[in-house]
Curated annotation (Swiss-Prot):
Species this chain originates from: Staphylococcus aureus (strain NCTC 8325 / PS 47)
Gene that produces this protein: atpC
Stored PANTHER family: ATP SYNTHASE DELTA/EPSILON CHAIN (PTHR13822), ATP SYNTHASE EPSILON CHAIN, CHLOROPLASTIC (PTHR13822:SF10)
Assigned GO CC terms: plasma membrane; proton-transporting ATP synthase complex
InterPro entries tied to this protein: ATP_F1_dsu/esu_C_sf, ATP_synth_F1_dsu/esu, ATP_synth_F1_dsu/esu_N, ATP_synth_F1_esu_C, ATPsynth_dsu/esu_N
Pfam families, per the entry: ATP-synt_DE, ATP-synt_DE_N
Membrane topology: Peripheral membrane protein
Function field: Produces ATP from ADP in the presence of a proton gradient across the membrane.
Localization (cell): Cell membrane
Coiled coil: none
Family of the protein in this entry: Belongs to the ATPase epsilon chain family.
Keywords linked to the UniProt accession: ATP synthesis, Cell membrane, CF(1), Hydrogen ion transport, Ion transport, Membrane, Transport
Summary of subunit composition and partner proteins: F-type ATPases have 2 components, CF(1) - the catalytic core - and CF(0) - the membrane proton channel. CF(1) has five subunits: alpha(3), beta(3), gamma(1), delta(1), epsilon(1). CF(0) has three main subunits: a, b and c.
Protein's recorded name: ATP synthase epsilon chain
Length: 134
């Protein structure tokens, strides 16, 4: 089976790089997309969600924030603000972030940035979902 290289990049640099990937599944703003070696070149916007990485002897899940994906014949490059494998996610920290975001959303104070709190809640919930996929 032909394989591809997956590289996930954040502002801190490459945080995940793997060769011999058989399938990459991502959530784009237009829906879910699966990519295998030889896929047509594509660029798409990603929404906060997970990346499923299937390789010869297993599957790995990575929580990602909004970003972009570029697909070439044998390479997938994902550019996002944040990315964490399911194993790396600190569940307690994610629960605290969720509680903090929910508290901000419940607060009627005009100083609360509702959009920012909603995004924080979305990211925390995503991290908790992906952590369960270990």
């Amino acid at each position: 089976m032909n394989t591809l290289n997956l590289d996930i990049v954040t502002p801190n640099g490459s945080v995940y790089n793997r060769d011999n990937v058989e399938l990459v599944v991502m959530q784009t703003t237009a829906g879910e997309i699966g990519v295998m070696s030889g896929h047509i070149p594509t660029v798409a916007a990603l929404k906060t969600g997970f990346v499923k990485v299937k390789f010869h002897d297993g599957t790995e899940y990575i929580a990602v924030s909004d970003g972009f994906v570029e697909v070439r014949k044998d390479k997938v490059s994902i550019i996002v603000q944040t990315a964490e494998t399911a194993r790396e996610i600190d569940v307690e920290r994610a629960k605290l972030a969720k509680a903090r975001a929910e508290s901000h959303l419940e607060n009627d104070d005009d100083n609360t940035d509702i959009h920012r709190a909603e995004r924080a809640l979305e990211r925390a919930n995503n991290r908790l979902r992906v952590a369960e996929l270990k």
